[in-house]
Every structure is written in C-alpha cells, then in structure tokens.
Amino acid sequence: GLSIEQIERIEGNIDFPSLAPLIKIARVLGVRLGTFLDDQSELGPVICRKKDSNDTNSIGFSNNDSKARKHMEYHSLSQDKSGRHMEPFLIDVAPSEDGVDFVLSTHEGEEFIYVLEGVLEINYGKNTYILEEGDSIYYDSIVAHHVHAAADNTAKILGVIYTPY
C-alpha cells in the first residue's frame, strides 16, 4: 500500500507516483490506468507520429519511493486512445547510480519490454536478466521487479504495460 505521506505528496503535486502505486490507485478508484495519463478520448485508431511528439507528453517515474530518483522517462504512444487496457511507451532509461539499492515494484498485469538501444538489467523475483539491443522480455508484473540500465549505460526501450480493468 501507500503511506499517508506518499498520498499527501502525490495530492500536493510534490511527487508523481511510480507505476506500481499509480496502478494500485487506479484499481482502488475503479478506473483504468490510462485515466491518469490522458486528457482526450478517441474511440477509433490513434496514430502517434514522430514529428508530433514532444517532451510535454513524457512522465518521469521513480520506483515506489518518494525519495527515489526518477530514472525512467516515459513517452506515451497512446495517450489519446480511450478505453485502452495496454499502455505502450517509449522509455528513456538513465544510467544506474553506484551503491543504489533498487526498490522492487509489484502490481497487477503484464509487461513487455523490447530493447531499442543500450543494455538493460531487470531484477525479476530472485533472478537478474541482462537484455541487449534487439532482446525482449515478457513477464507477469505481480512478481517483484525492477528495470534499470546496466552499469553506466543509458538505454531506450519500448515498453507495453497491460493492466486488467
């Protein structure tokens, strides 16, 4: 769950919750995750063109901890699609910091990640996986996990998050 302090920081626009708490908040409120991420609705197909993308469509998430750094910048590829159950993102992953303990997250749903650039390290349960450019992983997000760039590298990934409604 979320602490009262975390909820107050979110309500006060001091912190933007990480993905796991955001999914939990959506479930408690009975709304889909996309409700928090979009402000328009399109019933038909949604096309996202590179020439129209900008940084105002991005969200920086920390991972479950209000004190954690925001190591991932999410660029939504579907923010105008109403009623969606999948959340596709292009994600810029900042280099890992030495000595940082990663806070594992867990939430309902599934995630698919495809590495476009760089090297990614994924802690999943008790296992660690290294993914390089062209590699992918599909996993149940109810298992504790953390996604970060390996060593001092940056990475760019395509991530698709499915959350049941």
Describe each region flagged by the PLM.
Residues A20-T35, S41:
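DNA major-groove recognition helix of helix-turn-helix/homeodomain DNA-binding modules
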Residues L90-A94, S105-I122:
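Short, conserved beta-strand element in jelly-roll/cupin
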Residues T56-F102, V160, P164-Y165:
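A short glycine-rich, His/Asp/Glu-containing loop-to-beta-strand
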Residues L2-S18:
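Recognition helix of helix-turn-helix/homeodomain-like DNA-binding domains
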Residues K70-E73, E132-E133, S141-Y165:
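Ligand-binding loop in jelly-roll beta-barrel domains
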Residues D38-D65:
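Solvent-exposed, charged amphipathic helical/linker segments at domain boundaries
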Residues L77, G125-S141:
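Short acidic-glycine-tyrosine-enriched beta hairpin
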